């Protein structure tokens, strides 16, 4: 490394120091998904970011999705995916594959990436330590012709109803980094597949996390000119939904952010997971890397 490169690194570390001190001993939940999960280079950068958070005294917790991988496995096994109102129906055979893919292959791949940095990651799902309990999701859809709402039966798709933070508190006091798959049991004995965004929001809310980061395939919330909005209050976010600035798939993402804040998260960030080291850029730089939503 040249003297000039060393000088640049030293300057960057000096600039990051106040933010390292701000987040020391604080919990940051990161929902890992989107394009970053399918790109080896971005995956390694993400693992490096999580390791550096831990080394800086932060308590990072990773929650991950895996929709495309689930779809690919179902296709390989010759199981046709069924959808209701645009949402995947998860029957008994499908939920077994969902658990196998999420809590098995994907979870362990992420754990291995983080472990390669020298840190200790541990793979979990909602079943471990009775961490999360779920119940059958109650989803409705409005018929555009009759304007009548009907209930969707999505099978074993669940909503989080309870989070027990005991295991996560224990891990926070250790050197372990939890990597959690969004699968959880119900009190009825069934296994439920849970949307990874809402699962991450429930975990972050139960822990009163300082930050919840959603890694997506977009820079964050954009205004009508296509420019990134750096910060929004909950009231401002709701107004942008109402006037159509926030639309399409960004609406449920922002609504999940709002629910997480109502549950106790101090701030939620939507940022671009396709940018290498976006987690560090968000946490350890002055202007962050995405859209911060606060109370």
From Swiss-Prot:
Gene responsible for this protein: argB
Protein name (database record): Acetylglutamate kinase
| Compartments, as annotated in UniProt | Cytoplasm
Q: Tell me yes or no: is ATP-binding among this UniProt entry's keywords.
A: yes
The record's catalysed reaction(s) read: N-acetyl-L-glutamate + ATP = N-acetyl-L-glutamyl 5-phosphate + ADP
Q: Keyword Cytoplasm: yes or no?
A: yes
- Protein's pathway: Amino-acid biosynthesis; L-arginine biosynthesis; N(2)-acetyl-L-ornithine from L-glutamate: step 2/4
Q: At which residues is there a site annotated Transition state stabilizer?
A: 31, 253
Task: Report the source organism.
Answer: Rhizobium meliloti (strain 1021) (Ensifer meliloti)
Enzyme class, broadest EC rank: transferase
Q: Which UniProt keywords apply?
A: Amino-acid biosynthesis, Arginine biosynthesis, ATP-binding, Cytoplasm, Kinase, Nucleotide-binding, Transferase
Q: Which GO terms describe its biological process?
A: arginine biosynthetic process via ornithine; L-arginine biosynthetic process
């Amino acid at each position: 490394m040249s003297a000039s490169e060393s000088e640049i690194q030293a300057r960057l570390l000096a600039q990051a120091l106040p933010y390292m001190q701000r987040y020391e001993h604080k919990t940051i939940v990161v929902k890992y998904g989107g394009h970053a999960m399918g790109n080896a280079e971005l995956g390694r950068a993400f693992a490096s970011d999580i390791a550096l958070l831990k080394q800086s005294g932060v308590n990072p917790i990773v929650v991950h999705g895996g929709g495309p991988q689930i779809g690919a496995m179902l296709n390989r096994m010759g199981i046709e995916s069924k959808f209701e109102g645009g949402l995947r129906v998860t029957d008994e055979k499908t939920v077994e594959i969902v658990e196998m893919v999420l809590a098995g292959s994907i979870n362990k791949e992420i754990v291995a990436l983080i472990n390669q940095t020298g840190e200790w990651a541990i793979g979990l799902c909602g079943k471990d330590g009775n961490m999360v309990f779920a119940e059958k999701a109650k989803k409705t859809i409005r018929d555009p012709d009759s304007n009548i709402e009907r209930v969707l039966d999505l099978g074993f798709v669940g909503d989080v109803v309870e989070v027990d933070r005991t295991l996560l508190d224990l891990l926070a006091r250790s050197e372990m980094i939890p990597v959690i798959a969004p699968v959880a049991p119900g009190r009825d004995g069934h296994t439920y597949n849970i949307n990874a965004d809402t699962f991450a929001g429930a975990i972050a809310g139960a822990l009163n996390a300082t930050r919840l980061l959603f890694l997506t395939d977009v820079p964050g919330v954009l205004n009508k000119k296509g420019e990134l909005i750096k910060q929004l209050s909950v009231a401002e976010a709701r107004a942008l939904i109402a006037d159509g600035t926030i639309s399409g798939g960004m609406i449920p993402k922002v609504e999940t952010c709002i629910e997480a804040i109502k549950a106790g998260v101090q701030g939620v960030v939507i940022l671009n997971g396709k940018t290498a080291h976006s987690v560090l850029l968000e946490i350890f730089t002055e202007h962050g890397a995405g859209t911060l939503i606060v109370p």
